UniProtKB/Swiss-Prot annotation:
GO terms for molecular function: toxin activity. This is Neurotoxin ShK-like1. It comes from Nematostella vectensis. Disulfide bonds join C39-C78, C47-C71, C56-C75. GO terms for cellular component: extracellular region; nematocyst. Its main location: other. Keywords: Cleavage on pair of basic residues, Disulfide bond, Nematocyst, Neurotoxin, Secreted, Signal, Toxin. Neurotoxin. In vivo, induces contraction paralysis followed by death (within 2 hours) on zebrafish larvae. Also induces body contraction in Nematostella 11-dpf polyps. Residues 39-78 form the ShKT domain. Residues 26-35 form a propeptide. Coiled coil: none annotated. Expressed in nematocytes (in planulae and primary polyps). Is localized predominantly in the body column nematocytes and not in the tentacles (in primary polyps). It is found in: Nematocyst; Secreted. Residues 1-25 form the signal peptide.
Length: 79
């Protein structure tokens, strides 16, 4: 049973890596600016969504705690 669990965890990890690489396609110079400003996204494919600023302002949203933890240092988002 532990092999099945390990396989599921590996698939989920690879899916998250692939998703973050696919949607975080920033131009090279923009990436440098973000690094210089110390913007850190734990999950860029989540933090770049258009509805994130609205969630940051709404403490009653069901995903508020998760978004604030993951996207706290996102430039222009939950700062």
């Amino acid at each position: 049973m532990s092999r099945k669990l390990l396989a599921v965890l590996m698939v989920c990890t690879f899916f998250l890596i692939a998703a973050s690489m696919g949607t975080n396609a920033l131009p090279f110079h923009e990436g440098i600016e973000r690094r210089a400003a110390k913007c850190v996204d734990k999950m860029p494919f989540v933090c770049m969504r258009k509805d994130i600023p609205a969630i940051c302002k709404n403490r009653n949203h069901r995903s508020y705690a998760f978004i604030m933890d993951v996207c706290r240092k996102t430039c222009g988002q939950c700062t």
